[in-house]
C-alpha cells in the first residue's frame, strides 16, 4: 500500500499539473459571462452600433428631444454655410460672429473640424480595427467597405473645408500622423471607393441589414453610392489632374461596375424608422430655440 501511494499519488499530481499547464491561456483569461471577438463577428454584432453611429455622424441626427444633434446642425448648416447661401434665415444674429457674416472664429472652427472629421473618425475606427482582425472574414470586409464609403462621404466635407487632413495614415496606429495634402486625400478616397465598390459588387446577400440606416443592407445601392461619389470627385479634379479625372469618370460610368445613382429610390438618406426612431436635427433650432427659418 505504501508503495502504491508512493507511485500513484505523485503520478496523479504530475498528470494534474500537465493538464493545467496545457490549458489555453486565452481560455483562462476569458470571461464566462462575456463574449469573444469570434462571437461578436457572428451576425455583425461587432459592427452594428458603430455603423449606426457612423452613418448618423455624417449629418448629425438623433432622437426627438435630443439637443446635441440640433446644436451640431446649427454649426454645420443653419447659421453657417446654409445661412450664407440663403437656404436659412435666423432670428438671432449672434453679434454677427458666425461664418454667415464671414467671421471664422477659432472656437467655432474647432467645433466644425470635430464634427466633420473627429466624430466620423470615432465611429469608423472601431469598425476598421475589428475588420482588420478578420481579414479572411468576407462579411467583415463587406462591412468595412460600407464603412469606408461612409467615411469618404464625411471626410470629403472635411477636406473641402480645411484642406489637409489625415487620411492615408488614419487607423494605422500612428499617434503623430502627418496630414495629407488635399491632392493625396482625393487620390486615397477615389482608390477606397473603387475598392469598396468592388468588394460589395460580390455580395450575394444583404450586408448588416439590421444596422444599416441608409440602404437596409442593399449592397447594390452602396455600390451606386460609391460610384456616384467617385464621379463627383473625378469631375472636381478635372482642372488639376485631367488624367486622374478621366480614369475615374470612366470607372464610375462603366455599367459593369454597378452603375451610379439615377433615381430618387437609390439616394442615400436617413429618416425616422422602426429600426431607429429619429427626428430632424433642424427642428431643435426651429421649434425649441426659435432661431431658424427657411430662406
Describe each PLM feature range.
Residues 2-10:
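Bacterial N-terminal signal peptides that target proteins for export
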Residues 13-14:
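Core hydrophobic alpha-helical transmembrane segments of single-pass membrane proteins
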Residues 41-45, 90-295:
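Structured, solvent-exposed acidic/aromatic patches
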Residues 23-86, 133-134:
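Membrane-proximal, proline-rich intrinsically disordered regions
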Amino acid at each position: 500500500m505504501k508503495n502504491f501511494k508512493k507511485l500513484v499519488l505523485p503520478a496523479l499530481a504530475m498528470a494534474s499539473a500537465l493538464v493545467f499547464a496545457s490549458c489555453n491561456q486565452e481560455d483562462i483569461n476569458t470571461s464566462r459571462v462575456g463574449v469573444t471577438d469570434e462571437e461578436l463577428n457572428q451576425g455583425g454584432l461587432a459592427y452594428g452600433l458603430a455603423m449606426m453611429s457612423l452613418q448618423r455622424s455624417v449629418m448629425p441626427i438623433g432622437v426627438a428631444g435630443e439637443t446635441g444633434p440640433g446644436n451640431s446642425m446649427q454649426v454645420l448648416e443653419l447659421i453657417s454655410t446654409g445661412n450664407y447661401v440663403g437656404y436659412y434665415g435666423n432670428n438671432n444674429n449672434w453679434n454677427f460672429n458666425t461664418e454667415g457674416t464671414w467671421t471664422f472664429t477659432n472656437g467655432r472652427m474647432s467645433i466644425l473640424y470635430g464634427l466633420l472629421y473627429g466624430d466620423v473618425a470615432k465611429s469608423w475606427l472601431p469598425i476598421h480595427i475589428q475588420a482588420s482582425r478578420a481579414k479572411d472574414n468576407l462579411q467583415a470586409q463587406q462591412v468595412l467597405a460600407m464603412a469606408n464609403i461612409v467615411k469618404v462621404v464625411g471626410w470629403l466635407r472635411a477636406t473641402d473645408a480645411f484642406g489637409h487632413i489625415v487620411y492615408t495614415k488614419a487607423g494605422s496606429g500612428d499617434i503623430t500622423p502627418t496630414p495629407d495634402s488635399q491632392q493625396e486625400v482625393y487620390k486615397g478616397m477615389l482608390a477606397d471607393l473603387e475598392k469598396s465598390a468592388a468588394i460589395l459588387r460580390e455580395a450575394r446577400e444583404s450586408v448588416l441589414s439590421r444596422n444599416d440606416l441608409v440602404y437596409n443592407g442593399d449592397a447594390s445601392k452602396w455600390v451606386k453610392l460609391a460610384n456616384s461619389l467617385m464621379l463627383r470627385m473625378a469631375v472636381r479634379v478635372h482642372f488639376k489632374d485631367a488624367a486622374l479625372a478621366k480614369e475615374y469618370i470612366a470607372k464610375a460610368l462603366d455599367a459593369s461596375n454597378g452603375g451610379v445613382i439615377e433615381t430618387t429610390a437609390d439616394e442615400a438618406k436617413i429618416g425616422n424608422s422602426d429600426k431607429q426612431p429619429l427626428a430632424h436635427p433642424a427642428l431643435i433650432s426651429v421649434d425649441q430655440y426659435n432661431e431658424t427659418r427657411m430662406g
